């Protein structure tokens, strides 16, 4: 059985764009190393893309978070830095209009054989990472789901810690590097 790495929304707008925050750029190298590790082991890699249209501000999310970001076709929608160079045509890609990906959930449920483990990295820990980790755990309840704390972050350190704590309560393992 293969392992699965899900790179969640490591896009320009979340790193140094309209919703970027200090420290998000520091995840580039650890995430790149993780992708290379999985690729060298011939494991499976998937990417999620937060994907909005020009009418974003008219959506429920846009009314609650009135900051245009990750507009399809705009530079902010693209993967950030070195991560953009590491995606391959054979990787799975899930564009999502909201925090969690229903398509990812369905794909995980249909995966046969199931994955040995599912690991998530990327942004933002307390929004899209937690949403997709919960979906992964729901889709594959017998598969270990892992979030690498060194490869995720939030604009608010307190919310990052709370997200990791909530995930632990849902039996999602948080890797913490000391």
Question: What is each stretch, according to the model?
Answer:
Residues 73-126:
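Internal catalytic-core helix/loop-beta-alpha segment
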